[in-house]
Swiss-Prot record:
The active site is at H173 (proton acceptor). This is L-lactate dehydrogenase. NAD(+) binds at V12, D33, K38, Y63, G77, A78, S99, V116, T117, N118, S141. Pathway: Fermentation; pyruvate fermentation to lactate; (S)-lactate from pyruvate: step 1/1. The keyword Disulfide bond does not apply. GO terms for cellular component: cytoplasm. Allosterically activated by fructose 1,6-bisphosphate (FBP). The gene is ldh. One of its GO terms (molecular function) is L-lactate dehydrogenase activity. Catalyzes the conversion of lactate to pyruvate. It catalyses: (S)-lactate + NAD(+) = pyruvate + NADH + H(+). InterPro entries: L-lactate/malate_DH, L-lactate_DH, L-lactate_DH_AS, Lactate/malate_DH_C, Lactate/malate_DH_N, Lactate_DH/Glyco_Ohase_4_C, NAD(P)-bd_dom_sf.
Length: 311
């Protein structure tokens, strides 16, 4: 038996439920949303395809139905309105989380809490602070999606299977994120060397263009279709699978830091071992001096926001 509760049945929540239903790793999925009819409709829509896949029980519920869930995926939150600043949105969602998280904990304080709502790094830290849950049991989807975008772009550049591209986007899931080029490789061959062997461009301008494309990917998609949800739902599925299967896989999830690269009291993404008990350990990467400074800058930006929150 494996149960996942998804809080928020919007684009991301509903699509995550769909990808998890297809995964075959979950026996029960409950969708919880203030708009109960939306959750009921999404659950029915997914359920009508169950005869064609592995059996899974998908249904709509309330906070009390998170009881017994192995993983609670939080996608609920306010959307940014025209003219609203990022800080306004952060404060609004922090208020929502301060009300919602204690309600969830009433019914389940044993689950892994996976935060997906943006700004994910801030809300992961907010959840960690107000929940009182042990370190590792609360973390965010972080830059798992960004790293996937990065690998995809490099695979297209090199005409290679993206699964053979090993690269990480670290730091904030947002404007200050960056690629850890110093450890990027293709099947063990450094990216620089691989490009040299294959006659591919790998200069400073190319790297800058790739990073900018990763950072701006969501903006581009939102401009075209209004929202992003397919790829992030695949990222959610991958993280949940790592937990339920106790894979101890390495993913760039966002966790509260406790001294990595001189940073603490914020949540940021670094490659981390993820298994049945959540995040087991954050890996210490051999970053370049420039990358360490970029990471610290990302942390500083997050810390400035956190200082303005009432948590």
């Amino acid at each position: 038996m494996s149960k996942v509760a998804i809080i928020g049945s919007g684009f991301v929540g509903a699509t995550s439920a769909f990808t998890l239903a297809l995964s075959g790793t979950v026996t029960d999925i409950v969708l919880v949303d203030l708009n109960k009819d939306k959750a009921i409709g999404d659950a029915l829509d997914i359920s009508h395809g169950i005869p064609l896949i592995q059996p899974v029980n998908v249904y709509a519920g309330d906070y009390k139905d998170v009881k017994g869930a192995d993983v609670i995926v939080v996608t609920a939150g306010a959307a940014q309105k025209p003219g609203e600043t990022r800080l306004d949105l952060v404060k609004k969602n922090t208020a929502i989380f301060k009300s919602m998280i204690p309600e969830l904990l009433k019914y389940n304080d044993k689950a892994i809490y996976l935060i997906v709502t943006n700004p994910v790094d801030i809300l992961t830290y907010v959840t960690y602070k107000i929940s009182g849950l042990p370190w590792g049991r609360v973390f965010g989807s972080g830059t798992v999606l960004d790293s996937s975008r990065f690998r995809y772009l490099l695979s297209k550049h090199c005409n290679i299977d993206p699964r053979n591209v090993h690269g990480r986007i670290i730091g904030e899931h947002g404007d200050t994120e960056f690629a850890a080029w110093s450890i990027t490789n293709i099947s063990g061959i450094s990216f620089n060397e691989y490009c040299s062997i294959c006659g591919r461009v790998c200069n400073t301008n190319f790297r800058k263009e790739v990073e900018e494309e990763v950072v701006n990917a969501a903006y581009k998609i939102i401009d075209k279709k209004g929202a992003t949800y397919y790829a992030v739902a695949v990222a959610v599925r991958r993280i949940v699978e790592c937990i339920l299967r106790d894979e101890n896989s390495i993913l760039t999830v966002s966790s509260p830091l406790n001294g990595q690269y001189g940073v603490k009291d914020v949540s940021l993404s670094l490659p981390s071992i993820v298994g049945r008990n959540g995040v087991a350990r954050i890996l210490d990467l051999p970053l370049s001096d420039e990358e360490v400074e970029k990471f610290r800058h990302s942390a500083s930006v997050m810390a400035d926001v956190i200082k303005q929150l009432d948590i």
